[in-house]
């Protein structure tokens, strides 16, 4: 775990230094019982990241992510937000997020099944808008092999890329770079 955290941290720091406008990606091909949830939180802590989004293709893993965060002294004061926890407080996940103390680290857990769902007009569900509007420090794709290559999953992220590119002026870029 220690080596994985150090190697990932070093890679992220070097990648951002070399290409500050490129978002680095790193894959942990970890075996079961490696401790990826705990190691992921350690990585976020070591890097000083405070907005962490965990997206999973297998919602049944939520309890492991929650328990590793709330039960370990290393993450005291960190906040865990999910649909399940929000419902237990009679709230939606977005309400729970807005109530969170923004001066402390926040971990939001969500499933692709929920994120890929749409409202009646085909848009983003109101309760999930904050996920799309937040600038996350770290996004973790968990159980990636369970559905990352499905068309709906690809569409979700392709749409995000298109939306962020809307303000890009190719002519201005060419002129500025000339």
Predicted regions and their residues:
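SF2 helicase/translocase NTPase motor core
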Residues: 1-178
